[in-house]
């Protein structure tokens, strides 16, 4: 799924990038995927207040804007101050509506939902369109996580999400695997899982996220 850029310069850049990628790509199932071109999309990042959903949404917004798309955003902060982790009152979200034409609202229903835990899924799932893309962090769906979200069964196993395109991703395990060479402790690596999810969304939308995120977190010289 890719948004068509508005700027001719951006189109030329993307064509050049794709040509360079094709020259080195191997013939894999991923390399044979043909993205569906659409003119707009609404995406929502949702998780605990400490999961970095606001910065993740902001970075995604910056990149989308660099590609020449019109945007409207809706940051959603919980009313509670530091609600217990994993609970319904502590869910934070960031919604972005971006398009190749003018955008006037952040959107009502969403095309893509990224849920970092069961509470985020429960609070936001009603807004996801049928056949919408649902990405969940399966590492956070343990018994204790489900109990905090007031769930009695695991929604990833009871077919209640069958009307969506569900991608159950081990975000914590994959993030740790990607960062294991840096010598970070487990807690520090787990704090980066929001940017792993951000990278997945860049790929999903055929965006080169490097331009919007490469300087984030670097100390200014």
Regions flagged by a language model, labelled:
Residues 2-221:
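Active-site cofactor/cluster-binding pocket
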């Amino acid at each position: 799924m890719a948004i068509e850029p508005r700027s001719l310069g951006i189109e030329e850049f993307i064509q050049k990038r794709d040509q360079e990628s094709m020259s080195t790509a191997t013939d894999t199932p991923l390399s044979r995927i043909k993205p569906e071109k659409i003119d707009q999309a609404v995406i929502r990042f949702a998780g605990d207040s400490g999961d970095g959903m606001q910065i993740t949404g902001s970075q995604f917004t910056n990149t989308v804007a660099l590609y020449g798309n019109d945007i409207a955003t809706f940051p959603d902060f919980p009313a509670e101050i530091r609600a217990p982790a994993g609970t319904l009152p502590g869910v934070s979200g960031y919604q972005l509506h971006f398009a190749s034409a003018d955008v006037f609202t952040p959107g009502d229903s969403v095309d893509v939902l990224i849920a970092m835990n069961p509470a985020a899924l429960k609070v936001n799932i009603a807004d996801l369109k049928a056949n919408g893309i649902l990405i969940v962090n399966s590492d956070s769906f343990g018994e204790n996580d489900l109990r905090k979200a007031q769930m009695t069964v695991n929604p990833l196993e009871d077919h209640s999400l069958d009307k969506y395109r569900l991608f159950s991703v081990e975000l914590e395990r994959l993030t740790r695997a990607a960062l294991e060479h840096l010598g970070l402790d487990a807690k520090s690596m787990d704090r980066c899982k929001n940017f792993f999810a951000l990278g997945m969304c860049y790929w999903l939308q055929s965006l080169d996220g490097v331009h919007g995120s490469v300087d984030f977190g670097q100390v200014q010289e």
